[in-house]
Amino acid sequence: MSFFKSLFGGKKQKEKSEKFCSPEHLLSHLQSKADIALSQKNYSEAVQYLKEALEIKESVNLRESLADAYLYANRLPECFEHLQKIAEQKSDDAVLQLKMAEVAWFMNNFGAVADACERALLLDDKQVKIPFLYAKACWEQGDSTNAVAFLLRCKTIEPQFFIPIYTLANFLFELKSYEEVHEVLELIPEKEGLSLEVLHLKAKLACAEKDLNMALKLYNLLLQMYPLFALAWKERAEIKVALNDKEGEKEDVLQYEKCLELDCKNGNTQASKTNVEQLQYQLYHLTLSDIASDDEIK
């Protein structure tokens, strides 16, 4: 019986076993396991499967998947390392360079951000996210001249894009170039003119220029439109102190404390901040947000 099995069935069984253990089959198996792990958010498992797959076969696609898995797992240095290796083989890929810049931004490696943006700009000078992120990196490194220059470049690429214009105005405000802030604010698209960010900057600008009556009017409008913006209550209270309105100051401080309490109850730790950080995040991390959700790459 065993003779006939070996004669007629043994070869088939052997071929099946060899096929199962072949590098190609094992590679496919590991990729499948990695996909399942990613779909279940088991990112460490996915990383392990993809690393094993890369040991079997070097592949740009596999390395890209591994970089993404590291990103999901919030292991940014490893993600950046693999993106660098991919870039060695895809040196003409502007999107890849932008992605490297974005990952470096999360790592607070602003020099690497600037380097990647410079390479990306040589490949694509029409993508507004590149000079915008380059400007942010320059600013973080104390290079305000180039920061302003790259934001002006954003304005040239997309004249009606709000975030770079607002960021330029904000940078100039921090540089105390108040006249230029006024000029840039004139460039803000009309539909954004009453946004929280713009109104707040205008109010702070009036305050910095010692025009307290105008500042008060702007804070009144700001709080009328955004009554839960805690920081504005605090700042308006300070103006009322300067204007000798002690009762008004007490009322605003009370409202400020109520807003903070409400935000704490709602689990919002960003009570005293504008939402411009989130708008900026959506711009210069747009590529990353296609891969990982906000809570996965904090």
What are these regions (language model features)?
Residues 57-58, 91, 125, 159, ...:
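Short coil turns that delineate tetratricopeptide repeat
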Residues 20-61, 65-72, 102-106:
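Alpha-helical segment of the N-proximal tetratricopeptide repeat
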Residues 52-53, 85-86, 119-120, 153-154, ...:
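Canonical positions in the second alpha-helix
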Residues 28, 61-62, 95, 129, ...:
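Start-of-helix register in tetratricopeptide repeats
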Residues 39, 72-73, 106-107, 140-141, ...:
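Register position in tetratricopeptide repeats
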